[in-house]
UniProtKB/Swiss-Prot annotation:
Organism: Mus musculus
Residues bearing PTM Phosphoserine: 587, 590
Gene of this entry: Slc26a1
Superkingdom in the source lineage: Eukaryota
Family assignment from sequence similarity: Belongs to the SLC26A/SulP transporter (TC 2.A.53) family.
Statement: the UniProt record of this protein carries the keyword Transport: yes
Result of knocking out the encoding gene: Mice exhibit hyperoxaluria with hyperoxalemia, nephrocalcinosis and calcium oxalate stones in their renal tubules and bladder. They also display hypersulfaturia, hyposulfatemia and enhanced acetaminophen-induced liver toxicity.
Residue span(s) of domain STAS: 532-690
GO cellular component, one term: plasma membrane
Protein name according to UniProt: Sulfate anion transporter 1
Intracellular or extracellular location(s): Cell membrane; Basolateral cell membrane
Transmembrane segments: 68-90, 94-116, 185-207, 260-282, 295-314, 347-369, 382-404, 417-439, 477-499
């Protein structure tokens, strides 16, 4: 056991603090122990495994019927009512029939009820994922030879087949119409994304989603919202334009809209204006008086009901050629295994889909868990969301994740547990079995308006950009880069750009952290930045240096430049000149003036001082998170150079991990007691030790 460099004083009594020896366990032993623990078969282990996979088994027996039931039923009914129009509307984004959105909402609510760890999050159709699914579906439809100008909704599309001028890429596809092939692509993509998420959950990779920072997610939501708005503009105007894909989709779509704006359907334009006015006004009033409203007003449902009645009795489709939702069948279709060939082709697209879905789900689950005082498991959330994609993929469903807007509605209407999801699923089931055909005459421009209004929250995030810039310019850059790339290039490229700039921002913050010389605060034992605070007392003939970041290969040169600039002494060059002798041009001029010495690389004509103005350099290692091999070599070279100049290098406030790295890296040498002479528990103790040693040396010289 290692003793600390000096005893700690407590109540006037000296207490010797000893560090416990670290428990060293090799990688093989650790893997064996974890494997043994995982493979242990017993009844308690089996029960814990089942309860871990299905948390509902744990909390359902503890359900407080009188306290929770009313709120869960109310929130479930409201969410179910909201889900129906949103599911039909979001089918436009995914390029699929509305019935598949209803299937997705039904199965996702039931599965997350059993497997989710969040009490409040609503998992189901999400606009951003619908957009990503729709883009892959459109691309694969084009590759398969289908006419890209045809849409999935509407009676005109029921007999849509392969374009006669195109060559199909799929053997036997001639018997599959457009809608059939579209759902094949969507289910294959969903199954692959779900498998990725389940695999991440099994491998305990829930922490990976946290690398998608909040500015990245907000910028991605903003850019994707602009893309969604662009894709719905043609439906609100009633203009038939080709569906653009790939680079610059947003720009090409707006150019096509401007070129064909004269062909707009007046009926769709008037209907869109009325629906947008009603929806936006109702949303603004709901936001303003939300504290007085016990239950949110289901404006979308009212708009859909009224619009469907007007469209049916006004015969808008027949008289004005306004496109409608078309036939929505009732009941469930037989399950089908997703096409393995398509799965391999969309495997890369499924990665971004899985990452975005899991990141939003985990971040929302953790956010609401913190605000309501309970905890969630990121790994179990991955399993839950993954199963919400894997199992429903066999029942003609597409990708799902947590949705912020519906989660907020659940909380506002009194949701207490995930039992509300069962109630929501029951409402969707009622529509699936009985009410779905009633939406036959619903205009698609109404659905587009519902989608656009649902983007209010994401589009409003642009107002947060100035405050984000004042708080952190690096995060603001990540936000702008992600959003701009989503809009100007593609959503997948936007996600990659966000990850790249996030890593670049992280590297920049660690590559050039703040460095400062410290001085003493009065007669206390605390030290602070001498450049930031007035009235501090610098220790005599001692330089205390602080580097607020890790020391590794990317910033080792910046570490040395900062130290040399602040202390006014380039130790490496000075030590070299001293070894070569006085003929190299040594000058008596001191370098303790704080001027920048520039690069650490060697150069001719460097002026080397004889009087440095200090005899000890103390490095405050409290902010030093870790050392790598390059950082260790830097400290060892620095100690060697200082020793050549008769300057002592001391380290203070080293964490146990840094101490271990120093010991294993040979910084402490082989001398007995070297750790007590080089490492100190505080900056003040290091300064006092340096001054005491200096006085001892001066006394010894005087005696001689």
């Amino acid at each position: 056991m290692d003793a600390s460099p000096e005893p700690q004083q407590k109540g006037g009594t000296l207490v010797l603090v000893r560090r416990q020896p670290p428990v060293s366990q090799g990688l093989l032993e650790t893997l064996k122990a974890r494997l043994k623990k995982s493979c242990t078969c017993s009844m308690p282990c089996a029960q814990a495994l089942v309860q871990g996979l299905f948390p509902a088994i744990h909390w359902l027996p503890q359900y407080r019927l009188k306290e929770y039931l009313a709120g869960d039923v109310m929130s479930g009914l409201v969410i179910g009512i909201i889900l129906v129009p949103q599911a039909i509307a979001y089918s436009l984004l995914a390029g699929l029939q509305p019935i598949y959105s209803l299937y997705t909402s039904f199965f996702a609510n039931l599965i997350y009820f059993l497997m989710g760890t969040s009490r409040h999050v609503n998992v189901g159709i999400f606009s951003l994922l619908c957009l990503m699914v729709g883009q892959v579906v459109d691309r694969e439809l084009q590759l398969a030879g289908f006419d890209p100008s045809q849409d999935s909704l509407g009676p005109k599309n029921n007999d849509s087949t392969l374009n006669n001028s195109a060559t199909t890429l799929i053997i036997g596809l001639q018997d599959c119409r457009r809608d059939c092939y579209a759902i094949r692509v969507a289910t294959a993509l969903t199954l692959m994304a779900g498998l990725y998420q389940v695999l991440m959950g099994i491998l305990r990779l829930g922490f990976v989603s946290t690398y998608l920072s909040q500015p990245l997610l907000d910028g991605f939501a903003m850019g994707a919202s602009v893309t969604i708005l662009t894709s719905q503009a043609k439906h609100m105007l009633g203009v038939q334009i080709p569906r653009h894909q790939g680079l610059g989709m947003v720009v090409h779509t707006w150019l096509s809209l401007l070129q064909n704006v004269g062909q707009a359907n007046i009926c769709d334009v008037v209907t869109s204006a009325l629906c947008l006015g009603v929806l936006l006004a109702a949303k603004e009033l709901s936001d303003r008086y939300r504290h007085r409203l016990k239950v949110p007003i289901p404006t979308e449902l009212f708009v859909i009901v009224v619009a469907t009645i007007v469209s049916h009795f006004g015969q808008l489709h027949t008289r004005f050629d306004s496109r409608v939702a078309g036939n929505i069948p009732t009941g469930f279709v037989a399950p089908q295994v997703p096409d393995p060939k398509i799965m391999w082709r969309v495997a890369l697209d499924a990665m971004s889909l899985a990452l975005v879905g899991s990141a939003f789900s985990i971040s929302l689950a953790e956010m609401f868990a913190r605000s309501h005082g309970y905890s969630v498991s990121a790994n179990q959330e991955l399993l839950a969301v993954g199963c919400c994609n894997v199992l429903p993929a066999f029942f003609h469903c597409f990708a799902t994740s947590a949705a912020l807007s519906k989660t907020l509605v659940k909380i506002a209407t009194g949701c207490q547990t995930q039992l509300s999801s069962v109630v929501s699923a029951a409402v969707v089931l009622l529509v699936l079995l009985v009410l779905a055909p009633l939406f036959h005459d619903l205009q698609r421009c109404v659905l587009a308006c519902i989608i656009v209004v649902s983007l209010r929250g994401a589009l409003r995030k642009v107002k947060d950009l100035p405050q984000l810039w004042r708080l952190s310019p690096a995060d603001a850059l990540v936000w702008v880069a992600t959003a701009a790339t989503c809009v100007l290039v593609s959503t997948e490229a936007g996600l990659l750009a966000g990850v790249f700039f996030s890593l670049l921002s992280l590297a920049g913050r660690t590559q050039r952290p703040r460095a400062a010389l410290l001085a003493r605060i009065g007669d206390s034992t605390f030290y602070e930045d001498a450049a930031e605070f007035e009235g501090l007392l610098p220790p005599p003939e001692v330089r205390v240096f602080r580097f607020t970041g890790p020391l590794y290969y990317a910033n080792k040169d910046f570490f040395l430049r900062s130290l040399y600039r602040l202390t006014g002494l380039d130790a490496g060059h000075s030590a070299t000149r001293k070894d070569q002798g006085p003929e190299v041009g040594v000058s008596n001029r001191s370098l303790v003036d704080g001027k920048d010495l520039g690069s650490v690389s060697s150069g001719a004509g460097l002026v080397v001082p004889l009087a440095f103005g200090f005899h000890t350099v103390v490095i405050d290692c409290a902010p030093l998170l870790f050392l790598d091999v390059a950082g260790m070599a830097t400290l060892k070279d620095l100690r060697r150079d200082y020793r050549a100049l008769d300057i002592t290098l001391l380290l203070a406030c080293c964490s146990p991990s840094v101490r271990d790295t120093l010991r294993k890296g040979g910084f402490l040498g082989e001398e007995q007691g070297a750790e007590n002479e080089l490492l100190f528990p505080s900056v003040h103790s290091a300064v006092e030790a340096a001054c005491a040693r200096r006085e001892e040396l001066l006394a010894a010289d005087s005696a001689l």
